[in-house]
């Protein structure tokens, strides 16, 4: 049988720029358009071939397009995708972060993401008191963006962990909700802090 992928590649779909300062503070202050070459060097040092800048609840086309130029250069970067890390009040009082990655083939639609997030639903639907979108508004925004997407949920601990879940982690929704999401294949993927989480999730799913 022919393989879909001949080899594994390194990807990083969770990079923040200065446009995440509202939540990340000064630690991203130097992650500017002018410093994209420094980012590229770091990605190449780690042999990352696919990447995305996924700022908190916003999108900047200029910094995306500057990084995307690297696709045509003779370095490790083969693909740059547009994305946003959305803060979503998934259930009452529980906000989780969903890294949302978009198809890059329609550049006009990709360019329009910035307008939607800054001047459209991305601005008007944002609940400042919660620092998040409602689940309904999140999907309304995706509908307006009108680009194929994948959703990647934060999960930094294993389902069997006895420690308190991280804030904005999908496990913070509670075990019952987490079970439902896993078995419904609600999210396309989960973001793991380490490889063990992936293994434990597979075992957990099989056991259930």
Q: Predicted regions span which residues?
A:
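Short, surface-exposed, polar/charged, turn-prone segments marking secondary-structure boundaries
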Residues: 38-40, 80-81, 108-112, 127-129, ...
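An N-terminally biased module of ancient metal coordination in phosphate/nucleic-acid-related enzymes
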Residues: 1-93
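Short, flexible active-site-adjacent loop segments at beta-strand->alpha-helix junctions, enriched
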Residues: 86, 102-104, 157
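Ordered hydrophobic segments in well-structured contexts
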Residues: 50, 81, 97-101, 150-152, ...
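Short low-complexity stretches enriched in small and charged residues
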Residues: 4-7, 52-59, 104-110, 140-145
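Short C-terminal domain-edge/linker segments immediately following a structured domain
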Residues: 40-46, 112-117, 130-133
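Domain-core and long-helix interface of multi-subunit machines
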Residues: 1-36, 62, 118-208
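A basic- and aromatic-enriched beta-loop-alpha substructure that forms the phosphate/nucleotide-
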Residues: 91-128
């Amino acid at each position: 049988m022919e393989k879909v992928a001949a080899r594994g590649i390194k990807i990083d779909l969770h990079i923040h720029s200065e446009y995440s300062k509202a939540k990340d503070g000064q630690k991203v202050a130097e992650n500017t358009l002018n410093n994209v070459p420094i980012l590229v060097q770091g990605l190449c040092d780690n042999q990352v071939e696919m990447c995305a800048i996924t700022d908190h609840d916003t999108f900047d086309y200029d910094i995306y397009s500057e990084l995307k130029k690297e696709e045509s250069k003779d370095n490790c970067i083969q693909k740059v995708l547009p994305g946003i890390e959305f803060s979503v009040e998934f259930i009452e009082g529980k906000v989780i972060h969903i890294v949302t990655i978009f198809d890059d083939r329609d550049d006009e639609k990709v360019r329009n993401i910035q307008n939607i997030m800054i001047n459209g639903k991305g601005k008007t639907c944002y609940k400042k008191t919660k620092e998040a979108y409602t689940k309904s508004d999140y999907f309304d925004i995706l509908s307006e963006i009108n680009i194929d997407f994948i959703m990647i949920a934060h999960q930094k601990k294993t389902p069997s962990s006895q420690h308190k879940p991280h804030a904005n982690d999908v496990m913070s929704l509670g075990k019952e909700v987490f079970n439902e999401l896993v078995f419904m294949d609600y999210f396309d993927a989960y973001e793991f802090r380490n490889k063990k989480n992936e293994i434990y999730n597979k075992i957990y799913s099989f056991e259930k």
